[in-house]
C-alpha cells in the first residue's frame, strides 16, 4: 500500500474526520447552531474569526471566543485538520513570521539557548518602539516551527500574545528587527542563508492562524517551546527569562491567540503606542481569497496544479499570459484569485504595473466573450509541456472527488456521484445541450486515434448515445475505484484507535458493494442521465459553426479570416460541428491534379476575364457570412462543362456547406407564411447553392429571387418544425440550357444578376478548325470528380482565389473588372426588359442638355418606341411611370418645384439620331454587343492575372464570337 500525498490526505481527511471524530462533530454543531448569530459580512471591521473551510467570518464576544478555543483545542489534540484565523485588532499580540532559506536540507536546531537570546533581542526592540506600562509584568514568547524542510525552505513563528500593541508599533518593531545584526548572527548560526531578509514585513497586520490550524495543503506549525520574560519598570536593566514548563497542560489555542485576553497563563499587557500609532490604522481583513476558493472549489484546486505545470514563458511573455487570463476569465468569474496568483509568478512584471494590467485584461475578457479560450486550452498547454506530470495530476483529481463522496456517504455511491467524477474526467471532451425539440443532445470533441468518419477530427461530433462514456465507466473508472480501495486499506493497516478502525472496515464493505454497480447497464444509464445535467452547456448548439470564416475540413479546421488561410490541425476551442471531407492543402500550380483542373477551367471558360470573375465568385462559397447581392445565371446548350464545374464545387464543399436546389424554388409561387418549405431551408447555413437543367422558358419568381439574393434575415420552416429565422449566405448559380424569363423592369432586381453564355462544346470528334470545340474526356464526369486528390486540388484552387480576392479587391466581387460578363448581362437584360432596351438605345447621358423632360413625356416616348419596334399595345401611364422610377434612370430623375418628376441631364434620341460630343449611352458602353472571346494558350499562368482596365496578358489571342 502506498500512503497518499499530504495534499490528498488534506482534502479526504476533512471529510473523514467528520464521521469518526466526535470533537469535530461538536465543533461543527457549535459553529452552525450556536455561533451563527455572530456571523459578519466579508470585509467587516467587526470580524475577529475567519473559518477558511466555509469562508464564513464571525464577530465573537470574549465568552464565545473561549468556547470556540475549547473546541478547537480538543480537535487539535485529536489531530483534526483545522483552518481558523484570527484577525488582529487595533491592539493585539505580536506575531513574527520568519521564512528561512537554509544552506542544507537539514532542520535547523533552534535550541532553547539560541531562542532565549532571540527573545532578549526582540524585547529590546519592543522597549525602543513602545511605552511599557509601569510595574512588573510577565511577557511570554512562544516558538512554533514548520514541521519539515521543503526544498531548502523552512520557517518558524514567534508569538508574543500577551503584549497588546498597535499595528503601527508592530511595524516599527519589525522594521528595526530586520536590520538587527545580532538577530542575523543568531539565525546565521542556525544555518540560515537569508538572515537579513527572512522576516516577513507584513506579519504586523495580516490575519494569523490559530494554533493547530494551517494553510490549505500544509501541515500546521508545531510548538517548540515557550519563554517567560519578567520586566520591572523599577529595574529595567534586570530582565530574567526562563523556559515555560508543562506547557502542554494549558489550552494552547487560547494561550497562543493574539487577541485573547483571558488566558490562564498569558495575561494581557497593554502598551501605549508611539506617536505614529495615535492615528488609528485600518487593519486589513485579508480574506485569503485564493485559499478559500481552493477549499470550496475542487476544480480551482485542480486548475491551480495544472497552471503550475506551465513553463515560465506563460507568465513572462504578454501574449501567452493574456491567453491564460482570458482562459480563466471565460471559465469562471470566480477564478480572478487564480489569475492574480499566476501573474505574481513573475515578480518583476507584477511589481511594475502587473496588477493594473491584470485588472484591464480581466475586464476585457468579461466584455469580449468572442475570444473563446477556456480551461480546455490550459489543459492542452499543460499536457503539451509536461505530459507525465499532467497525467498524474489529472488522475489525482479524479481520486479526490470520488474519495470525498465515498467518505461523506459511508461508501455508498449513487448515479449523480459517479456522473460528477465522469464530468471531471471527460468534461473537456463532451458537451450536452437541448435541441429545438427539447431533447438532450451529446457532442464529443473528436481527437486523433479514435474511430471517426473522414472529416470529424478536431470537431464536435453529434452523438445519439455517448457510447464512449458507457465503455469508459466500466473499463477506466474502475481503476479510480481501485485506488479508493487501496486508500481505505492503507488506513486499516495503521495503528488507529478501535473506533476509527471500525469506521474504515464498515466503509470498505459498503464501498465494495458500490464498485460492482459500474458494470450494470441500468446503473450506467442512470449515470449518463445525471451526466446530462452536468455536461450541459447552454446555447452550445446555437454557437456551433457561427463563425463564417471557419470551415471544417477533412484534416482539421480552416480559418480564412487571415491571409493566407490557416489550417488548424491541433487542439482549439472553436465550436465547429460541420465539415467537408476534403483535406486542405495549399495551392500548388505544379501539382498534377491542380494543373489538370486549371487547364480544364481554361477550356470551359475561354474568356480570361470571365474565367477569373467566375472563379472569384465561386471562391466566395467557402465563406458563409453576408455577401454581395449577386446571382450568376449560366446559359449553355449542353456538353460545355458548366454542370461539371458546379457539381465539383458542391462536392468539394460537401452537404454541410453546399446544396443542390430545386428549380421550383425560383419558378413557383411563394408558399403562404404558415406552410413549410424544405427546399428553402436547404439554404440555411450554406455557403453555396446551385440550380441546374431547367425546362424551356422557365419564368423566374422575381420576389423570391430578390429574397434569396439579398443579404439579411429570412424566415422558413421544415415540415413539422417551428418557423426559423436565418441569414442568406449562399453564393448561388443557376444553370440552364435555355434562357430564364425574368418579367420585370425593376432595376433593383436586374443589378443583382450576372449572365454568362457558354461558348465551348466538348465533342467526341471536335472540328480542328473550330477553337470552340474541344475533345471530350468522360473521365472528368465519371472518375476525376470522385477522386479525393482531384477534390483536394480544386478546394485549394477555391482558397487561392478567395485569398486573391481579399488581397487585390478587398473581397468585393463588384470591383473585379469583367467586360465579358458585363456586356453579356446587359445583352440578356435587353432581351428580357424592353424598358431597359429602350433606355439603352434611345436615352443618353447629356450633361450639357438644356431640355428637361416631364416623366409623362418619357412615358410617351417609350410607348411610341414600343409600338414601333415590339408590338402594338395599350400602355398604362401610371404603371410605366413607376417602372421608370425603378429603372437605371432613377439617378437622373428629380423633383420639380411643382412636385412632379422630371428627367434632367439626359436626352432622348430620335430614330437614326447619333450622339453629340460629350454624350454617352446609359448602361454598358458596348450597348449590349458581345465581345470577342480571347483564347488562352494552354501553358499561360492565367490564374495570376488581376482583371482591371489594362489589357490582357501578351499570350492571349482573340477569336471571333461563335
UniProtKB/Swiss-Prot annotation:
* Swiss-Prot/TrEMBL induction comment: Expressed in the late phase of the viral replicative cycle.
- Asked if Transferase is a keyword of the record, the answer is no
Query: Is Translocase one of the keywords?
Result: no
The source organism is African swine fever virus (strain Badajoz 1971 Vero-adapted)
Q: This protein's superkingdom?
A: Viruses
| Binding sites annotated in the UniProt record for ATP | 636-643
Question: Which Gene3D superfamilies does the record match to this protein?
Answer: P-loop containing nucleotide triphosphate hydrolases (3.40.50.300)
Q: Where is the SF3 helicase domain?
A: 607-775
Provide the alphabetized UniProt keywords. ATP-binding, DNA replication, Helicase, Hydrolase, Late protein, Nucleotide-binding
**What does the sequence similarity comment in the record state about its family?**
Belongs to the asfivirus helicase C962R family.
Which PROSITE patterns does the protein's record reference? SF3_HELICASE_1
Q: What is its EC number?
A: 3.6.4.-
**Gene Ontology MF annotations:** ATP binding; helicase activity; hydrolase activity, acting on acid anhydrides
Into which EC class is this enzyme placed?
hydrolase
Q: What's the protein name? A: Putative primase C962R
Where are the bilayer-spanning segments? none
A single GO BP = DNA replication
